[in-house]
Amino acid sequence: MDKYDDLGLEASKFIEDLNMYEASKDGLFRVDKGASNNPEFEETRRVFATKMAKIHLQQQQQQQLLQEEALPRAGRSPINGGNRQGVSSKLAADGAAKPPLAVPTVAPGLATTTMAVQSSYPPQEQRTRPSAHGARPGSQNCGSREGPVSSQRPALHGLGPCEDPSCLTHGDYYDNFSLASPQWGDKPEESPSMSLSVGSGWPGCPGNDSLSHRSCGDSHPYHPQLSMCSGRSFESGQDSGIGGHSSEKPTGLWSTASSQRVNLGFSSTGLENGTPAQPKGTTVSAPMVPSSTSQGACLRRDSSLGYEAPGRVFKPLVDTQPWLQDGPKSYLSVSAPLSSTTSKDNAQTGMTAGLDPKLGCVESGTSPKPSPTSNVHPVMSAPSELSCKESPPSWSTDSSLGPVLPESPTPSRVRLPCQTLTPGPELGPSTAELKLEALTQRLEREMDAHPKADYFGACVKCSKGVFGAGQACQAMGDLYHDACFTCAACSRKLRGKAFYFVNGKVFCEEDFLYSGFQQSADRCFLCGHLIMDMILQALGKSYHPGCFRCVICNECLDGVPFTVDSENKIYCVRDYHKVLAPKCAACGLPILPPEGSDETIRVVSMDRDYHVECYHCEDCGLELNDEDGHRCYPLEDHLFCHSCHVKRLEKGPSPASLHQHHF
């Protein structure tokens, strides 16, 4: 055993043994039945159980002290006959919440006890719910190779002088309770003391011993213990209970940690928090297989607690004799824990029906009955998480072919406690989302670079948009980016500098003068000389900037609006209007646009041009226009209004005026 002194080595060895578990449908662990009796794991299980027994025994002793202080008793009798022994009692106190040891065979007729669930009860109910102290584990192990009985004690203890249950100790209370109990299924409608016998032989079946589970001070109300079966392993989360025809027997709460390996060596389950034990008959290894009845699930109710639990029925492959069909049956069911408040409210109802109201959910008509000729090997199923609106699954096994009794009416419905589901951690953004976010930020930065800049157009070199006056460069009638309009030889920017356009390329002055391109340079359209400096192109021709001037005022028109006549003479706008603008027929002056405008406003009448201010009546000076009373009535090439025109006609118009028409 020295190799297990190291706690790390011990834990590592035990974790290696967990590879015998296989995945279940509900995500928990299922025991590999093929490896349950492997002898190479016996030493590991024994050492691990011994270690855990010491830890749990300390916790149970503390719980026992607290219960004894809260429940002072007038008289005490020896606990369970006072026949308790060292390590065996420690292991029994831990129950099946720890990996069980390979237990020795117990001779027929002798009863041994194992531990079951210890629920926490309120102080006022502790008097009627004593918890058994540590008992020795032991049963008939079908698959064990150990022979003689290692430890045994009488199944029945003598009753103490005090018959009041309030003054009995844990063991004596259940012993007296078992002696006063009738046989299961005989008279289910009698007093609540019909709960099954514990620690005593099955009535009418001598030679068979009944195994029971006693709770040993486990303070957690929902942390159950495991019972053990011959050569079988339990799946975590299922319990077993016993009941008569229509009498209801409470079932315990069963669960086990997923990291524990269970090797079950007992042939039947026993008492859990006062639940009567299931007797053992002849050893008939009937493997349990699930049979889908009523579409794989049957609904069972508790007549006292109003609890509904859907479950599936397990039936053995081996049929029993017909005379056993009316006998006791053995069931396995999953019972969900009720809250302490619900248990208090329903305590009176549960006691009237012969139930322990603190055991949670009890099923009516499905509580197991013992079969005197069959040994049922229950399989624990993994417990599913309970929600506010779901009932826990219920699994049951039938050791005979007897029909399941009908449901009993429920006086009330009990709402189960809701288990809050914690949401998993939120996943971070995916790779695609990160790329999309980066692209969006890039586009936003590019848009922010030109928030409200003016758009000039597309660059002829890179075909991209030109935003803002700082990037725009116009040359040879085309639009460039400032960075795109560069010398073809040295790549220097040519904005604001002299450049030369040769054979479709632009060069700076230095590269043009020292490269021999002057032989093919453009000539000025006006002077005819080579353009060695800056070039100015207008109207499809090349000019020196100094040669491009107005023919009237000789002003340089580089960068200034200009116009040409039909002979391609260049004028500034002012001189163009002076020379080529139409003349007013009244005053003889050219009609020029007003100051600050390039548009000319004139009046055309009788195929003549007039200033707006010159178009009026020559006699009275009335401004003429298209309005009524202001219309023009010309006479002998003179402008008159209608009244002046009539006066002129009355004086005797000349023959030429007869042909005048009104305009």
Swiss-Prot record:
PTM comment text: Phosphorylated during mitosis.
Domain (LIM zinc-binding): residue spans on this chain: 457-518, 522-582, 583-651
Domain of life assignment: Eukaryota
Renumbered residue ranges of the record's region Necessary for nuclear localization: 459-663
Residue span of region Interaction with RB1: 391-429
Pfam families in alphabetical order: LIM
Descriptive protein name: LIM domain-containing protein 1
Gene name of the record: Limd1
